């Protein structure tokens, strides 16, 4: 049976189909990204389906977080999201057609019978799967009014082969596939049926998902084949099963590796969306040795041929290094707004924007930017770190008094003028510039790390800079008014 048009043609349709039972985790975000990029690369459609049939576990909060996370990453979707729970009647319609044409059957086996079957299989060390006991029996053999499920009639011999765009050719013996349930005893459709019907009705041409779904593909294909025989127009999609993301220890990424939702990388870790976009792109896909990609480059270059067969390892350090690069490339006003949100009401966005060029040089995340900018809004007396306190010994305070005197006489409060004045003072005192700059930094910021000391002086302004220096240059017993 022919599959839909292969990669490289027009009319590509992909879908991202999360279950709203939790946050949008990294694996899901990467699947969404790969589907979106593939569709955009070929000028096709990227669709979104919310698989919310598990009403006990699906929540509106999870749906909101998924949509918010996708929007934050810049993954826009064509058409409105499709909610699987609203399509139950369509799923049942297909199951009934499969029943009508002999591709499915009613199974009246009781739970007790199925438990006995599994126990016997365990005892015989056989694979545990349904044994087809109602496949060739007539419904009249069941007691009147007995509950039943509807099962798919899968091939009993031969093989099924999938030409997967990532895994290559994969073949299974049909005897390994059981007659799985399409409709439960309460008449509700199962995931396996709903996925196929929805993919068909949405016109999905390429199913790109984690390789933990590879076995599902072999179970889903018979529905395509049967429905194509019954009514035509049910070509199977092209499959691409992407290896999962692992932690640094090689195990599947999980909460113990720090795996959290996309919103945590934004809100708690201070990662920019373009950095996570770039990092997820490189988790399992490559284009030569290139590490950094703009959104436009990613769309232009992304193909399934670039997806590797082996699992990729998530590395927080690499993500933050990449994030640092994107911070340095980012617009200062945008960064200032993000930092202001971290600092709170005391923040001055205009001052932060002015400071951002020097603040962002070393920062790897928005949290570090906020920490680096905190000195701008500190109230006197400044709280000192232990290392800063050590620089403000008697000798350091004496030098600050001389710095204050020299800077007070400087009318041109610019980086160049302040640097010249301070260097002249250091030469006069026969000191290296660092011997003055270190206690100055401690007095001005309360820390031993900051942007260049002359940048700090300009950002704080003349009045505040001299007030902070004087507060530390004055002996403690006289400094209560500082």
Curated annotation (Swiss-Prot):
A single MF term (Gene Ontology): tRNA binding
Plastid recorded as keyword: no
Annotated motif 'HIGH' region, positions: 18-28
Intervals of motif 'KMSKS' region: 252-256
GO cellular component, one term: cytosol
Enzyme Commission designation: 6.1.1.17
Binding positions for ATP per the UniProt entry: 255
Compartments it resides in: Cytoplasm
Record's keyword annotation contains Ion transport: no
Coiled-coil regions listed in the entry: none
Keywords linked to the UniProt accession: Aminoacyl-tRNA synthetase, ATP-binding, Cytoplasm, Ligase, Nucleotide-binding, Protein biosynthesis
UniProt family annotation: Belongs to the class-I aminoacyl-tRNA synthetase family. Glutamate--tRNA ligase type 1 subfamily.
PANTHER family in the record: GLUTAMATE--TRNA LIGASE, GLUTAMATE--TRNA LIGASE, MITOCHONDRIAL-RELATED
Function: Catalyzes the attachment of glutamate to tRNA(Glu) in a two-step reaction: glutamate is first activated by ATP to form Glu-AMP and then transferred to the acceptor end of tRNA(Glu).
Quaternary state and interactors: Monomer.
Protein name: Glutamate--tRNA ligase 1
């Amino acid at each position: 049976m022919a599959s839909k048009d292969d990669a490289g043609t027009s009319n590509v349709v992909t879908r991202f189909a999360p279950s709203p039972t939790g946050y949008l985790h990294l694996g899901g975000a990467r699947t969404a990204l790969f589907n979106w990029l593939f569709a955009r690369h070929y000028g096709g459609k990227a669709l979104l389906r919310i698989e919310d049939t598990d009403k006990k576990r699906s929540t509106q909060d999870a749906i909101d977080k998924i949509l918010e996370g996708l929007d934050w990453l810049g993954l826009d979707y064509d058409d409105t999201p499709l909610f699987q729970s609203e399509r139950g009647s369509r799923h049942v319609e297909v199951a009934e057609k499969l029943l009508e044409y002999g591709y499915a059957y009613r199974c009246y086996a009781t739970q007790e019978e199925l438990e006995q079957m599994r126990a016997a299989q365990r005892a015989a060390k056989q694979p545990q799967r349904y044994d087809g006991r109602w496949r060739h029996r007539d419904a009249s053999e069941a007691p009147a009014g007995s509950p039943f499920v509807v099962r798919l009639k899968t091939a009993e011999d031969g093989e099924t082969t999938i030409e997967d765009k990532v895994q290559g050719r994969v073949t299974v013996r049909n005897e390994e596939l059981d007659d799985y349930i399409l409709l439960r005893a309460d008449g509700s459709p199962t995931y396996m049926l709903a996925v196929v019907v929805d993919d068909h009705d949405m016109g999905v041409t390429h199913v790109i998902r984690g390789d933990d779904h590879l076995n599902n593909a072999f179970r889903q294909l018979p529905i395509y084949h049967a429905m194509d025989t019954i009514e035509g127009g049910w070509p199977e999609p092209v499959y691409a099963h992407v290896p999962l993301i692992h932690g640094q220890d090689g195990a599947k990424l999980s909460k113990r590796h720090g795996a959290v939702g996309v919103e945590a990388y934004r809100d708690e870790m201070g990662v920019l969306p373009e950095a996570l976009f770039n990092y997820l792109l490189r988790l399992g896909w490559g284009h030569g040795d290139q590490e950094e990609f703009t959104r436009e480059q990613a769309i232009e270059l992304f193909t399934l041929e670039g997806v590797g067969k082996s699992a990729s390892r998530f590395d927080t350090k690499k993500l933050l290094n990449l994030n640092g690069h994107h911070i340095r490339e980012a617009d200062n006003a945008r960064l200032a707004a993000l930092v202001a949100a971290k600092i709170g009401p005391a923040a001055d966005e205009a001052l932060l924007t002015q400071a951002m060029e020097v603040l962002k040089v070393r920062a790897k995340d928005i949290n570090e930017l906020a920490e680096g900018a905190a000195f701008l809004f500190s109230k006197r007396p400044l709280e000192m770190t232990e290392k800063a306190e050590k620089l403000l010994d008697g000798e350091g305070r004496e030098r600050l008094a001389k710095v204050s005197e020299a800077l007070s006489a400087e009318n041109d409060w610019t980086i160049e003028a302040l640097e010249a004045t301070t260097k002249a003072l250091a030469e006069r005192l026969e000191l290296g510039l660092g011997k003055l700059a270190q206690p100055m930094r401690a007095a001005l910021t309360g820390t031993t790390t900051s942007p260049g000391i002359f940048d700090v002086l300009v950002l704080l302004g003349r009045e505040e800079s001299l007030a902070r220096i004087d507060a530390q240059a004055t002996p403690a017993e006289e400094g209560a008014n500082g």
